[in-house]
């Protein structure tokens, strides 16, 4: 219980207090339109999955970031595992993951993760992490160790990794993954470049693009993927320019979803994007050459990732 209280104290107001561009906690939120549908499904299966994760000292980004699709995914036995702890070294104001000084890496985590995936009989897994700017390789080696353990335990499972930007350590990342690769390498740009200081402080738009391209050059047969959250102040032209940049950097798959504010202390929603606009972006993206596009208000980067890779309709 103490751990839970500590984690909560590192979220919300305390997380964003030192940001140069602070969210306005007194601002009245925009009313949610009827197309924003959050499914709350309470079931024994959801509780059992949570119990399994806690027993192995594992966490999911679904829980830590308050994903609106948590109940639906958990009820179907799907989860995006979050490695390297619950505490992030960044203060992104859109995200509800805690900020602070992280603990040392759990050397048993890769083994626990592999055992859990085998126990759950998963065929497709997504692994993400907090930012670990305190580590020399940003946590790349830990990602690799997790992949190696999963491959040994469940050889046929497909693995997607949703990575941080590793703080500009491209050479270290490429060296670590030289002899080991996931099925999908996912790194989200999150927003348009002009909004980075407000939305994604500490990150660099061009570096993220270079990371995606460099990984694709090293592993041409690995699918590369990226995503944006919309409704934080971007224009249609800016979004289309980002899509063009992603294609220029050989990114294969795309996800587009609506940003939802986790609390009044987080970044405010500037607009709720109509489903028709998401459909328009999808058509444009496919014309630009993306192999698969998931675009809709409730789409998230790892939401039904196994279906996304098959090109099945996600909205």
Swiss-Prot record:
UniProt keywords, alphabetically: 4Fe-4S, Cytoplasm, Iron, Iron-sulfur, Metal-binding, S-adenosyl-L-methionine, Transferase
Protein's cellular compartments: Cytoplasm
Family: Belongs to the radical SAM superfamily. Lipoyl synthase family.
Associated pathway: Protein modification; protein lipoylation via endogenous pathway; protein N(6)-(lipoyl)lysine from octanoyl-[acyl-carrier-protein]: step 2/2
Cofactor note as given: Binds 2 [4Fe-4S] clusters per subunit. One cluster is coordinated with 3 cysteines and an exchangeable S-adenosyl-L-methionine.
Gene Ontology molecular functions: 4 iron, 4 sulfur cluster binding; lipoate synthase activity; metal ion binding
Main location: cytoplasm
Protein name as annotated: Lipoyl synthase
The keyword 4Fe-4S is annotated on this UniProt entry: yes
Reaction equations catalysed: [[Fe-S] cluster scaffold protein carrying a second [4Fe-4S](2+) cluster] + N(6)-octanoyl-L-lysyl-[protein] + 2 oxidized [2Fe-2S]-[ferredoxin] + 2 S-adenosyl-L-methionine + 4 H(+) = [[Fe-S] cluster scaffold protein] + N(6)-[(R)-dihydrolipoyl]-L-lysyl-[protein] + 4 Fe(3+) + 2 hydrogen sulfide + 2 5'-deoxyadenosine + 2 L-methionine + 2 reduced [2Fe-2S]-[ferredoxin]
Domain Radical SAM core: 74-291
InterPro entries attached to this UniProt entry: Aldolase_TIM, Elp3/MiaA/NifB-like_rSAM, Lipoyl_synth, rSAM
HAMAP family: Lipoyl_synth
SUPFAM superfamilies: Radical SAM enzymes (SSF102114)
Residues reported to bind [4Fe-4S] cluster 1: 62, 67, 73, 302
GO cellular component, one term: cytoplasm
Cofactors named for this entry: [4Fe-4S] cluster
Keyword Iron-sulfur in record: yes
Cited Pfam families: Radical_SAM
Binding site for [4Fe-4S] cluster 2: 88, 92, 95
Enzyme class: transferase
């Amino acid at each position: 219980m103490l751990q839970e209280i500590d984690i909560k104290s590192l979220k919300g107001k305390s997380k964003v207090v030192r940001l140069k561009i602070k969210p306005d906690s007194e601002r009245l939120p925009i009313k949610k339109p009827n197309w924003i549908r959050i499914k709350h499904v309470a079931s024994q299966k959801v509780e059992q999955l949570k119990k399994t994760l806690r027993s192995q000292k594992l966490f999911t980004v679904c829980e830590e970031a308050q994903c609106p699709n948590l109940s639906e995914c958990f009820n179907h036995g799907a989860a995006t595992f979050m490695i390297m702890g619950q505490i992030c070294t960044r203060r992104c104001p859109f995200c509800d993951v805690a900020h602070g000084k992280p603990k040392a890496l759990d050397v048993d985590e890769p083994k626990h993760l592999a055992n859990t995936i085998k126990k759950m009989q998963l065929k497709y897994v997504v692994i993400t992490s907090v930012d670990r700017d305190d580590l020399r390789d940003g946590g790349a080696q830990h990602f690799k160790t997790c992949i190696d353990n999963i491959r040994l335990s469940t050889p046929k499972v497909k693995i997607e990794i949703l990575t941080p930007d590793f703080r500009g350590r491209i050479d270290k990342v490429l060296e670590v993954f030289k002899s080991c690769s996931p099925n999908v390498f996912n790194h989200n740009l999150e927003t348009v470049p002009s909004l980075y200081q407000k939305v994604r402080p500490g990150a660099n738009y061009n570096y993220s693009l270079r990371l995606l391209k460099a990984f694709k050059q090293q592993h041409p047969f690995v699918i590369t993927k990226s995503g944006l959250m919309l409704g934080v102040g971007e224009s249609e032209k800016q979004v289309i320019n980002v899509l063009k940049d992603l294609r220029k950097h050989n990114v294969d798959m795309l996800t587009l979803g609506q940003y939802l504010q986790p609390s009044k202390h987080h970044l405010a929603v500037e607009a709720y994007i109509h489903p028709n606009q998401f459909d328009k972006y999808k058509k444009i993206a496919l014309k630009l050459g993306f192999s698969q596009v998931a675009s809709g208000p409730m789409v998230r980067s790892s939401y039904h990732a196994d279906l996304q890779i098959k090109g099945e309709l996600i909205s």
